[in-house]
Amino acid sequence: MQNLLEALVSRSLVHDQTPGLQARLAQGPITGYVGFDPTADSLHVGHLLAVMSLAWLQRCGGTPIIVVGGGTGMVGDPSGKRSERPVLSVEEIDRNVAAIRAQLERFVSFEGQNAARVRNNADWLRAIGLMEFLRDVGKHFTVNYMLAKDSVKGRMESGISFTEFSYQLIQAYDFWHLFRSEKCELQMGGSDQWGNITAGAELVSRKDGASVHGLTFPLLTTASGTKFGKTEGGAVWLDPARTSPYKFFQFWLNTDDRDVERLLKFFTFLSVEDIAALLAEQARDPGKRPAQRRLAEDVTARVHGPDVTRSVIEASRILFGGTDLRAASADVLDVLAGEIPSAAVTGDELAALTIADLLVKVGLAASKGEVRRGVAGRGFSLNGAVLESGDAKVAAGDLLAGGYALLQKGKRNYALVKVR
């Protein structure tokens, strides 16, 4: 079985590690955890490095623990933050915890000998009293030690509340609790979590005299210098209600050539050799972008499932060529309807409207005059066939699966009409 550290290092997924981790892994599988902040009801692609680290841990024989911060989410981690975030209510956090758990179940197995476990740190943090916490945790840390953490130093000028200042102690308590209750010996996280992770290892050492370990992965930026996972429309979410599967697929498909090797290593389970073969294929014919296509297909299938991914791929082919419209299923056209301008009409309305009327209705033309000029220049089409007249009507036999008709202006402007 592959060694966890070797697997992660081979994919450039390790930024830092505590001394002795390699020796501990050589002794056998390990139980490790990653914490997730429940301030939203969905994970986004910025969380996927953490998710993949848990998946690799399980593949290498270890037991992953997913700690959803129902307790720490009420405090707020200052790491990488310029200002204090609003504190969520218990009810909001509990709803978000349930949603995040459902998403994480797509990445790790909750069955078998090393089944993944989900823990909400509210279960133990809400049960500990202030006096007990100060006695059992606070006495092991000096203020100087806490002030030296980067997450605190970066906020000294702008101000940091005692609530956020104490966050590192609360996360340290998480690590100690999991070590005691579940023999968890490894915490993983982004490089901005290093201070919190080492605080936990320090607490375990002081209270129990035991060695536990930490591993961080790199904070990911793109070759253009922007933060990974951010688009003009904001974050790219795993929840299809927040980011549609089509837009999710396109996000990965549009990966810069300079980033694609790294993202294939980070976010797929393809072997390093298979990734090298993909890149060699891409070098021979860059226009086909096989590396980006494999990346988009792999990640979208894992997040949204293979059936949705196939529909998304077919919908993409409709817009960018390479598919027979008549063969497109209603599911594929439903996906497309969520991404391009669409209008719904009744059967009676369809019988009364000309194609020119429909083009105006969906916004592909401002007027019937524009349609006449466009038709003269062969600039409009219906279901892939160039329009000869805007005065014609869409017959029932012209409709695609699901009662759709696809209108097109030029090469890149599309709209759908659906008959109800």
Curated annotation (Swiss-Prot):
Belongs to the class-I aminoacyl-tRNA synthetase family. TyrS type 1 subfamily. It catalyses: tRNA(Tyr) + L-tyrosine + ATP = L-tyrosyl-tRNA(Tyr) + AMP + diphosphate + H(+). It comes from Anaeromyxobacter sp. (strain K). Residues 353-419 form the S4 RNA-binding domain. One of its GO terms (biological process) is tyrosyl-tRNA aminoacylation. It holds the Pfam family tRNA-synt_1b. The gene is tyrS. A motif ('KMSKS' region) lies at residues 227-231. This is Tyrosine--tRNA ligase. It is an enzyme of class 6 (ligase). One of its GO terms (cellular component) is cytosol. Catalyzes the attachment of tyrosine to tRNA(Tyr) in a two-step reaction: tyrosine is first activated by ATP to form Tyr-AMP and then transferred to the acceptor end of tRNA(Tyr). Its main location: cytoplasm. The keyword Oxidoreductase does not apply. HAMAP family: Tyr_tRNA_synth_type1 (MF_02006). One of its GO terms (molecular function) is RNA binding. PANTHER family: TYROSINE--TRNA LIGASE, MITOCHONDRIAL (PTHR11766:SF0), TYROSYL-TRNA SYNTHETASE (PTHR11766). Keywords: Aminoacyl-tRNA synthetase, ATP-binding, Cytoplasm, Ligase, Nucleotide-binding, Protein biosynthesis, RNA-binding.
